[in-house]
């Protein structure tokens, strides 16, 4: 019983912010790219690389943005974050947050449950995160932002690709040559430049490496529902 399947298996997507980027734009998109839907998003920008010269200011603004979140019933006007999907996922996120604290990441805000009822987790931001930490390697699927520092283009490309996953990525820069170079080098099925999660039904979507196989959407998505046939016919006499 051979099944043909298209698989989208999540990721640990890098988001790279260069010093020449529009900082306000980068902070906002990086924030939305992670905290959307309580962080329960397959393309979440869960490995945020920020160039060294703007790192401290980027962290400050990111923390300021995260602290503006209002938690509660997501159907209530004005609420920006609801609960996690279930207890199993809630426990996994809390465990990963605790691992970040123990492994030496700096907790900038959040870092635990919210309220006394339901599976709510405070919007959490870690700085001084290093690549070997669990929060930098494992898909958290929750409202936990990890901000890492880099010095050079070659370094950040190598670090961004050092993962089993390859679903999506983001690049923030005003330098077109840099944007093209990095986009081509990143091992990801989708790369957004100066934006994040800007999806279109015309664009194929899917992952590299352990993030899956096959594509959804666009012309490539239709190929998954078709069969290719070859017919070869021998003609006894040419007609012309």
Curated annotation (Swiss-Prot):
One of its GO terms (molecular function) is aldehyde dehydrogenase (NAD+) activity. Elephant shrews, in contrast to other mammals, possess both a lens- and a non-lens specific class-1 aldehyde dehydrogenase. Can convert/oxidize retinaldehyde to retinoic acid. Homotetramer. It comes from Macroscelides proboscideus. Keywords: Acetylation, Cytoplasm, NAD, Oxidoreductase. Pathway: Alcohol metabolism; ethanol degradation; acetate from ethanol: step 2/2. One of its GO terms (biological process) is ethanol catabolic process. Non-lens specific, predominant form expressed in the liver. Belongs to the aldehyde dehydrogenase family. The modification N6-acetyllysine is found at residues 106, 149, 151, 174. The active site is at 8, 42. The keyword Oxidoreductase applies. It is found in: Cytoplasm. PANTHER family: ALDEHYDE DEHYDROGENASE-RELATED. It is an enzyme of class 1 (oxidoreductase). Its EC number is 1.2.1.3. One of its GO terms (cellular component) is cytoplasm. It comes from the Eukaryota. This is Aldehyde dehydrogenase, cytosolic 2. It catalyses: an aldehyde + NAD(+) + H2O = a carboxylate + NADH + 2 H(+).
């Amino acid at each position: 019983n051979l099944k043909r399947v298209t698989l989208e298996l999540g990721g640990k997507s890098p988001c790279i912010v260069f010093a020449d980027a529009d900082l306000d734009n980068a902070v906002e998109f990086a924030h939305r790219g992670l905290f959307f839907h309580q962080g329960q998003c397959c393309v979440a920008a869960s490995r945020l690389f920020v160039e060294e010269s703007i790192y401290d200011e980027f962290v400050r603004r990111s923390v300021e943005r995260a602290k503006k979140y209002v938690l509660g019933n997501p159907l209530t006007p004005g609420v920006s974050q609801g609960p996690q999907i279930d207890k199993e996922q809630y426990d996994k996120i809390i465990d990963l947050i605790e691992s970040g604290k123990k492994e030496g990441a700096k907790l900038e805000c959040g870092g635990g449950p919210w309220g006394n009822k339901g599976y709510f987790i405070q919007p959490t931001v870690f700085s001084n995160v290093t690549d070997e930490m669990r929060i930098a390697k494992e898909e958290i699927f929750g409202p936990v932002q990890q901000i890492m520092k880099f010095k050079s283009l070659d370094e950040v490309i190598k670090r961004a690709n050092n993962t089993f996953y390859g679903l999506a990525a983001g690049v923030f820069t005003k330098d077109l040559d840099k944007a093209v170079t990095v986009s081509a080098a990143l091992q990801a099925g989708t790369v957004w430049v100066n934006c994040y999660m800007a999806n279109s039904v015309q664009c194929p979507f899917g992952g590299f490496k352990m993030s899956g196989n096959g594509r959804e959407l666009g012309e490539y998505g239709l190929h998954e529902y078709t069969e290719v046939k070859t017919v070869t016919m021998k003609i006894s006499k040419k007609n012309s």
